[in-house]
Structures are given as C-alpha cells and as structure tokens.
C-alpha cells in the first residue's frame, strides 16, 4: 500500500507541475500576441523587451524541458505571429500534427538509411581453398591496413597500395610484425622482409590449449616489446611478452636468415589465469579503460573486465553474467558502455563499473548474435546475427535505424564469421567466403553523388535571419524554403508567377515575415514567408515588351506607415523604381521612379543636381520625388553604339545614421551615387575609354557585376574596439550583432580630415535618458563602396571616388570575373564569388578604420565551392557557415573557418553544423582550400653587430714559417693549437668620412676583363745580363739553423736537408722587375 500511495503522490505532483507549466505557457502566448499587435500598430518596443523566436524557444524549453523540438516550436510561433487572434493549442508544442509522409515508404527509401546496401563491394579471396571462410578481421587505423585470417590458414593483408599476399591476424605495433594463431602455435610474421617474405616467420610452440582468439596490447612506452593476449578453449587468458631479441631483429641484414624458425614457448615470459569455465570467444584490450575484456559461453562468467595485473594474481575480477554467455562484445568510448551479444539474441548495454545489471537492452534479432561493432563518430551500434541479418542501432536513443540482410551466397556461405567498422573510410566490412564492404550513405552522398538542390540552375538565394531558413529559386520557377540547421525542406511553390514565367529576383523584409519575388515579365508578388501564401501582386503592363522590364534586383524598404510595403526594384533596362503595397489593396503599384542620369554624365560632368518635386503625396516615402537640373542646350544622344553599355547592372541601398544613398554600377564600369540628403547624383568613378568601342577589348570588360556599401554603425564600432579579433570568423555567435539597416541610434555628424564629403548628415538627436550608453558610442565613419568587376578585380572606393584598394583575389587561376559580394552585419569580413566557383574570404575589420591602410585588407581563405559560376554567396554569423548558390543547380554549405564542406540542401542526411566532420569534397570539386597566411614579424632578418672583424694585414704578418720557429714545444698532456686566426681579429675601424669611388675599368676592353691592368714590353732583355736574385735569401740560408730542442734532443741532422731544399725553391734570377713595374705604395 505504501508503494501505491507513493506512486499516486508522484503522479499527482507531476500533474500539478505540468498544469503550472501550462498556465505559464498561456501567459507567454498572451504576452507574445499582445506584443505582435503593438508592433503592427506602430508602437516602439525596446530590444530588451522584444520576444523574438530565440527568446520564445528558450522560454518554452524552460517550461517543458529540452525535449521540445525546435521545428514544432517554430511552427507554433510562426502561426502565432501571422494570426494573433487565432486559438492556440498547447499540444502543437509537442508536435501533435498529422504527417503527410508515409512512414513505411520513408523507411523503404534507401537514401534515408545508414548504410548504402546497394553500393556494397565484394572482394573474392583469390587462392583460397574450397569451403574456406574468413574467421577474423583486424583493422590497423594508423597504417590503413586490413588483416584477414581464414579458417584453413590463409592470412591476408589488404591496403590501398600493396596487393601482395602476406600472413597475419593482428599487428605488433612495436616490432612491426604480424602475429597469428593456430590451434597450438603462435606465428610471428615479418611481412616486410626482403626476398621471399612468405618464408620469414617464427613459430612459437607448443601451447597447452587450443588458441581461439588473440589481440595485441599497445605499449607505446616500451620500445622493441609487445604483449599478446590469447584466449583458449580451456577458459584461460594468456599473456605473452615478445621482444626484438627473441626474433633476431637487431641482427645485421647479411646475417639474418630467411627461413622458418621454431621457438620454444617456455623461453618466453608468459602468465595465464583461468577466468572462464568455457571457451574464450573474444578478447580485446580497451585502451580507454586501461584494461582487457574477454567473453565466453559461460553463463556465470560471461564477460570479464580487468587490468593486466589481475592475470598475475588470484584476486577477484569484475564479472558480468548473462544467460548462455556472450559471443562478442565491444566498447563505446563516448557513451561509456560495453555492448554484449550472445546466443540469447539480446543485446545488452553495461556500464563498466556496474556488473550486476545492464543499463539497457536491445531486442529484435531472431538468431544468435555473432558480431557487434560500434561507430564512435555517429554513435551507432551494428549487430550481426548468425542468419546474416544486420541491425543498426542508435546508442544514445536505443532506437533501431536500419535492418538489412546479406542475401548473396549459397547454403555453404551462410555464416559471417567476422565484422569490423572502418572509421577512416566510413565502411562496414564483413568476412565469410568473401569480403563485403558496406559504405555509409553519407559517404556516397558526399563524395560520389553530384549535389543538386533544384533540377535547373539557381537564380536567387536568400537567408531569413529571423526564422533561420533559406529560400532558393531556380530558373524553372520553383520556390523552395529550407531549414538551415537540418537542411530539410519546409515547403515549395510551383510556378509562382504563372505558367512558364521565370522568377529572376527576390528579397526578404527586415522582420522576416514577408518576401517578394520579381519575374522575367516585370510582375512582382509579395508572399507570407511562414505559409507561402500569396498576399499582393503587381500585374504586367499592357504595353510592356517581353524582356524590357525583367527585374534584376529587389530591396525591401522600411515603410514610414504601418500595414504597407515598399520595394525598390531594378529592371533590366536600368530603371530604378519603387513599388508600394497597401493593406486594403491586393494590387501593388509603382509610385516612384528615378530618372536616367547616365547620358548626362557621359559628356564629362562630375555631378548633376536634383530638384525636389512639389508633388503632394498622401503618405511619406523614403525617397522624395526628384527631377534632374540640366542645361537647356543639352541634347541626349540617341544613336550611340555605347548606349547599351550605359545601363545600370547592380544597385545597393544605405539608409542608416542619417544617410540616404543609392549606389549603382553600370555595364561600362561607371559608378553612380544618388544622394537624397544633398540632392545630388554624381559620378564616383568612370574608367578611361569606357564610352569608346575598342575592338581589342571585350564589350563587357569594364562591367560591374555587384556593388555593396560597407558601413559600420557606432554600436558595431564599439563592439569591434572591445573585441580584439583578427577576423569575423572569430566573432562570438551568441552576441547576435544587429543589422545596420533601419537603426534607431542617434545620428552623428560626419567629418573626415583632409577631404570634404558632400554627404550631409542630420542633426544630432538629444540623448535618451533611458539609454545613457548610446552617448558613449564612437562616431561612425563614412561608408565605403566595394565593387566586383568583370576583370576579376575587387576595388574599394570612398564616396568621393578615391580608390582605397585595388585587389586581385588569389585563386588557382588569376583574373576570374567576380559575380557576388556579401558582408556581415558589423562589416568585419567580405565574401566574394566568381564565375569558376571560387569563394574568397577577406578580413576588412581593421581596414575600415581610418586611414584605411591597404596592408590591413587581408585575404584569409579561398576555396572551390562549385565547378560552375556562383550567383550568390551568404555568410551566416550565428552558425559561422557560408552558403553558396550556383548555376549547377545546387546550394551548398561550408564552414567559414576552414572552407570545409558540410553538405547541400536537398540531401537526405541531416546537417551536422556543430560537429566537426572529416574533411571531404563534393565529387565535382578536386581543389583543396587555400589558406593565405600572414607573414610573421618575427621572420624578418635581424641585424647583428659583430664586436671583432678579420684583419688581413695581421694575417699577412703572421706567416706560417715565422710561427714555426717562434712556437715553443708543448708540455706533457697539452694540445698543440694554432691561434693564428684568432690573433688576426681586431676591432672594426669606423671611417669618419665616406670612401671616394672611381671607375678603373677599360670600357674598350670590355666589362669583364676591363678592370685588369694591361702592360706592354718594348723589347725583351737578354737573360744572361739579368741581375741575380736570392742573395739575401742565400745570406739567410748561410746562417746555421740552430737546432731546437724537442723532447730533450737536439735536431742537427735536418739542417743540411732544409738548406738544400731552400736552394731548389729560391729562383736564381729576378724576372719580376722586367715584367711587372714597381707600383708605388
């Protein structure tokens, strides 16, 4: 009764806590709905009080626990934001939705499974005997070797380079040998020996019992020594210690005999202990636990887990008992569990320190379990039954992921005796009469399948920061929305602008609830991002041509009034116009259009003034109605072949901190800046000869493919000054820097020393008492323009047209046309994509600070993302990933830190953004990322001051002959040394006056031999009248050379020999004075 009462009390307590959580959840929903109503009414809500999705999701997790799924909460939150008056059911938080997919069809879809069974590879063991089966498979990860041993004595080593047959069953790490076991012997094989390696092995025998399994204990601290663990049919675990001296490994190669040698097992150090009452089926050494494990068919002593010291004594050991014993076991390091399986068909999970009861059970096999392996990276357990049925389990959730069966082979090939998992190649390997290899599905998808998100080329890619979703549009006019965290598709829209109408542009508003699309025929539609429902439409005009009004760019503007939408659009003909949408009208209308200013700037004018229109409007718009103030005698050219190149190709917008700018780039390389504060439009840059037709250059050589404003708000500038970062990739994702567009910070005056800007900034607002920290924000610097050109150059400009940086990004091939630009919210990094599929990552954090040093603009990384042209590149700050879209029809995901491939949208496998996976490349990319390392300041050559220098004059004075006679005989135990070089060193002579240089070479003789002196002899002198030389030498030699004492003896016998030698060496005539005149000193 006490137990029942306690259970009832616990259930009552749980129900009470759940009711309290539901009440708090209802209050949270009411508060969120009220806040969304206030936002729609136009009321200002502070950022600290705003309930965004991240804050809402954190509150729900706090109420109901971390098991609430992100997708379900996001769906509920989107529904609440779209309709605040709708009834909210708390069951939706827990995913109470009807699934449209068939679970059976999803299970049968092979690409959703773990292993790709249809891609299985089979290797036939050539040379094997009939009915021979593989009994053991061992993987050596660091050498990438695969060792197999058959029942009838054939041992094979597989690798990716060598296909020769050698013998072995496990690998001796220190001795670099392969060890194998037979029923009564141990074989140590030198598979790398010269000559016939098949005959160079050692046999250790006899053994007391029949050996059934073997493993090697890794001993990294002991050189030239390995320990071998053996399990036999008597239940004993044996430990053999082998050294290099036992096999003569240290002998010379000439003395080494290539023959079979039988060694006595009694000569080896070995210990054994009986741990089981039946056969030892498997033995393994677990390095993570610093102990070994052995399993047996014994029901009482099924699994033993102990250190190696327990083999030398009789102390109790850790034993795990299970019915009918265990055939196999393995250890999972991350989960810290031991997985066992045996004849009772149950997989048990044990904690290494709890041997009384398993922590979990996996039931599903219909036959005895023969092998178990683990995939540490994916936390999977793969079990194999004697009927060749494979089951893949998730070790964390204990759920079944996949079941497959090996149906190949005849009746004699039924049993699979061994199985391993190769973590290096992501492959499951089994051994029977053949060797089968099952690759992981993600390995095939990532490396062998061409990524494709759409069937056609991608036209548009957008990222919704509010919902963390990606929108893609292809040329077949299919809109798809994807989850960034998982890569799953949320919904799709077919033919959004009608049948056979291509969508060419799109944009997402600042709140993330709406997105607009523009088509080839000039129509514009506004959609609800959460549901994909169409809200408003701009119909096609009656007099429009087919491609004249094709929309190239859409930008959402911040509306001055509530319940209205404003979109800035760029048409293919270069027209920039504004489209308005009202709440009570389903049709959009064009309310504003910029005049064409390019022809007026062609004749050399630098700027054109604007006149504000006096047209009255019922509502305020971000840009006023303007007209060009031009001279009356100006005539616009009509038939000019360069007029097609004057069209605007790309635009960007800056409306923050008092700036109201539109930048445009044309096909002929002209940069135009519309400034609605100063009422001017000016030509920032114009290339030379851009208005003339040059047959040697491509017509689009000066084309600007993309243009972008680089502006750092005061809040971001303060954050950049506090965070000493070298790149934007090191920015903390939890801080969540906000977008600079539509900021409500205080406006500061902009002044640049040394140059006068024509940008007028509004008056400074009074300091807000509620936000005193705003007054301490640093002053914002003027914006910078960056342009991506057709010639492959990346150029940065001031608003006055001064070139700050002209850079040719470093890729495999130079001068590749750039197509897309992107920067983060705090303008710390700059991303660029080109037509060959490369992504360029640059650090501009320090470059934006005056005086804009060119050396601070640094390219950090470059990698090949696609084989074809990239049309859009996006950087996601909170995840530190890069999104790339290409005309090859795929949208791919990359790590921004190193350029490693994560996956593509449309794949069946979920994304793993937080987990660092192995480096892989898509099948259509073969180039590795290039990291541009900065030259360290410590690598500069250092100048040393030498205290002494070599003096040649001292060296000449100290001749070897004079030193020979001045040298005193050394004493006993004293080394005789000559310090002539050290005596020739002296302090450097510093000249107070510079040396005078002069030219001595003879230019007529040539520069090589022109500096040599040339002498001419008028008539040769007769040799018999030449004066004799050597008189002084004979005088010196006539003096008796006194013998010097050496070891107490006088040397007088060598004097005549030295005198005669001197006579032979000294010349008897003086020829130097005749051929070489005396040179005055």
Curated annotation (Swiss-Prot):
Write down the PROSITE patterns for this protein, in alphabetical order: WD_REPEATS_1 (PS00678), WD_REPEATS_2 (PS50082), WD_REPEATS_REGION (PS50294)
Repeat recorded as keyword: yes
Q: Where are the stretches annotated Disordered?
A: 726-757, 1036-1060
State if Membrane is listed as a keyword: no
According to the record, where are the WD repeats? 102-152, 153-198, 199-265, 266-314, 315-356, 357-400, 401-444, 445-488, 489-532, 533-631, 632-740, 741-803, 804-857, 858-895
Instruction: Tell me one Pfam family matched here.
Output: WD40
Top-level division of the source organism's lineage: Eukaryota
Q: Cite the record's Basic and acidic residues compositional bias ranges.
A: 746-756
Identify the SUPFAM superfamilies for this entry: WD40 repeat-like
| UniProt entry keywords in alphabetical sequence | Repeat, WD repeat
Ranges of Basic residues composition bias in the record? 1043-1060
Q: Which regions are flagged for Low complexity bias?
A: 726-745
- The name of this protein is WD repeat-containing protein 64
Source organism = Homo sapiens
Q: Quick one: which gene encodes this?
A: WDR64
